[in-house]
Amino acid sequence: MRCRRAELATLAQGIGLGLGVEGPVISPTFVLARRHAGVDGRPGLVHVDAYRLGSAAELVDLDLDETMDRAVTLIEWGAGIAEDLGGSHLDIDIRRSGDPADETRVVYLEGFGPRWQDVDLSPLSEFPLGTTPDETGDNI
């Protein structure tokens, strides 16, 4: 899956929109974590910026375990400190292309744990830039 730079800025917003959470999804940079309530029994969204955290213990101090069973928890910059937070997680790794003049990003998805054991993520791997599976005729 390939994205443009502006599309990456809206990843968390798109996840929030898909979940139908209350209010705008904005960066948690200065507060570390923002919680967005779910509506009509749907899961909420917990958006964490772990860039300034020094250890997994600091992540645990955010009490994310209180909402893990009823919210999607999106952790930016969580590599190395967030893997053991829940029993299952989906890594979304966003990388720049090798060409410095090319602003596209490549998104790699890898599921871990029982939740993702039988999920085939390969249908998400190749869509034309700026499209969704439904727009290409594929329904996943």
Task: Report the location of each language-model feature.
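Short loop/turn motifs enriched for small/polar and acidic residues
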Residues: 1-3, 33-35, 95-97
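Alpha-helical elements of the RecA-like P-loop NTPase motor core of helicases
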Residues: 9, 57, 82-83
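Short phosphate-coordinating micro-motif centered on Lys-Gly-acidic
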Residues: 65-140
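Short, cationic motifs built from Arg/Lys/His that form the positively charged side of catalytic pockets
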Residues: 8, 52, 102-105
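Glycine-rich phosphate-binding P-loop
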Residues: 1-17
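Conserved nucleotide-sensing/catalytic segment adjacent to the nucleotide-binding pocket
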Residues: 20, 24-29, 35-77
